[in-house]
Amino acid sequence: MPAMSHQQRKLTTAAIVVLAATLVGIGPGRSEEKGPPVEFWKGHFARDAQAFHDWDNVKEIPAVCSRCHGADKVPEYLKEGKNTPAQHVKNGFACTNCHADLLTYERYNVPKVTFPGGFTIDSGHNDTNLCMTCHQGRESTASVNKAIAGLALDTPDTKLNFLHVHYFPAGATRYGTEAKVAYEYENKTYVGRFAHMPNVSTCTGCHQPHTGEVKIDRCGGCHDGINTVADLANIRMSTRGDFDGNGKEEGLAREIANLQDQLYAAIQTYSANVGGTPIAFTKAAFPYWYADTNRNGRIDPEEMKMANKYMAYTPRLLQAVFNYTFSVRDPGGAYHNGRYVLQLLYDSLESLAASGKAGVNMSGKVRP
């Protein structure tokens, strides 16, 4: 190997110094402009998170998962359009998963993002496109329609299986019908991208990129009384109406939570009346929706097994379950695009009500 020039040695030394300073959160590489020190136990660096360890008992992280669950597989996806399997992850994402240059902190160039249903979006902001490369979901209106094609709307079919939109599909929520990741009912109109104020119109405008934590101080500039994450539930935006039908207009997060509760109850009632066995949801284990064999309204440990996964889906039930799951998988949905989430929940309830088997009363509810 030829000897390095003086200039090459200087650049190499500088790179090592900056990288070391970055890793320990000190030195010139961690200036005010570069943000706070990296916290290696949160968000993208949550080394013990299940998102990085679900495959510890198998040889490698499968190619279909490695883009977003490998340590540094995003660059491979951006270059090749697909991934190879990844090695097990020890410390969350590597810095090079998002940063193309560790001296300048430049991120990879992402001109556009293709969502699961085939729709392509350019947010106009490179870092947002980079975030949406993973935060987009894995199923869509198209995949649900493909699964239920040709089937009677209210007839159980054991060939139907739960379709999981996946975790934190915030990009899909924000772009609404432009991405069509949630299930959109035929002959219904849905909102597209939620256009927020300029300083909070990007992913990193609202979230610390390493930890995902919300920049609460940005919210309080326009919304009075917002000092903590809990206060966010009071934000109403400009949307008017009593969406959940409880007789009062509340913060969008509360309206959404109430509609989620109503939809979940309707799903359970419909499943019992049409499928013969009620369905219930748990976040604890895939595929999350199981048969509630003892009819106590929840999934107990002995029910949480693949042999007990719910197998009496009708097309109507699958649609509603998909949208309920979408709404809970994006805990920030009220702020990413609250109107879109409310439309999904309302339409899912309305569909179940039309069956006459879900015990749903739509009176008093308003569709945004």
Where are these regions (language model features)?
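Short, well-ordered loop/turn and helix-capping segments at boundaries between secondary-structure elements
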Residues: Q136, S140, D224-T228, A354
